[in-house]
Amino acid sequence: MGSIIDAAAAADPVVLMETAFRKAVKSRQIPGAVIMARDCSGNLNYTRCFGARTVRRDECNQLPPLQVDTPCRLASATKLLTTIMALQCMERGLVDLDETVDRLLPDLSAMPVLEGFDDAGNARLRERRGKITLRHLLTHTSGLSYVFLHPLLREYMAQGHLQSAEKFGIQSRLAPPAVNDPGAEWIYGANLDWAGKLVERATGLDLEQYLQENICAPLGITDMTFKLQQRPDMLARRADQTHRNSADGRLRYDDSVYFRADGEECFGGQGVFSGPGSYMKVLHSLLKRDGLLLQPQTVDMMFQPALEPRLEEQMNQHMDASPHINYGGPMPMVLRRSFGLGGIIALEDLDGEDWRRKGSLTFGGGPNIVWQIDPKAGLCTLAFFQLEPWNDPVCRDLTRTFEHAIYAQYQQG
């Protein structure tokens, strides 16, 4: 009888998946991970924690465990939260998705477009053609880019026009000029940082207060904040950031500025710290369309492709040509995608009924955090690492293994 049970366990995809995570921890391929899955009905409530929250041993020579309530840096997984906050402002009539941002973000409206450099090396700046809307910001079609992703902005910074991100002031993040006009192309950039400023100006609240009152309070969340340094209860048990050395693959502690000081203001595109369990509450609320954060019709809008065909084609070409960035994390690179209000939308099933379905919404964060909400399958999943850089092959493969196992288990009932 024992051998029959052992054989059944060995064939169970969830057992095999969990074994893969434990082996990755034991072989020091990852410090730790938290993986979670929920369904609409409440029948699936899956959480597993593996390994440690740091590679640094404590005073007892132990590695403290990574747990479901360990405060972690969300990085760009913050963008979903800021999208929700902006859509709440829309629901309350404080801003319209297609209204120009001139009224609330005149500083953004006045920003020029960097076209290039003349023969003498001087920047060529021009006025923007067209008006930026909130929809442009939420879909990364405003013409803004991150400095590290765009050669024109890297050159602009090299000439001394921009401060280093080490200053950790939001103005340095918001200062770079645009690189194209609104609606001209899909470019990943500081759009959600600007959307966060829009929420602040529309409501008269800073983004931390707004987050606490409008996301944390409705969901009973107590460990989510932009202001980690002001939360000694979270600081004492937070995860460290770990970095994988590209030369030999070894892990090392990363003394990141994000953990040493709060930003001068709230970064709507990257600034939140949260326990994995609390972030899952947000995902599950959206999956259930329970009205605690957004009206059901607004949630439905998030899952509608928001790009016109030309922009959708350009975004797919850009993503296909950028495997080193791999915005979709574990998604197949050949998949047809669009962008919704909050993340990447799959325009086809990833693997029939055995993985994410057409219409699923996903994004992530730099420490290899990947979230996805799949309305058709009735599932949401979350893979939480605190290991950089993004698109780490070990984390990516483990995330795929996790999601496949959950879908297989769920299909079996």
Swiss-Prot record:
Known EC number = 2.3.1.238
Could you state one GO biological process linked to this protein? lovastatin biosynthetic process
Instruction: Mention one GO molecular function.
Output: acyltransferase activity
Its UniProt pathway annotation is: Polyketide biosynthesis; lovastatin biosynthesis
Reactions catalysed according to its record: monacolin J carboxylate + (S)-2-methylbutanoyl-[2-methylbutanoate polyketide synthase] = lovastatin carboxylate + holo-[2-methylbutanoate polyketide synthase]
Q: What happens when the gene is disrupted?
A: Loss of lovastatin biosynthesis.
Name of the protein described by the UniProt record: Monacolin J acid methylbutanoyltransferase
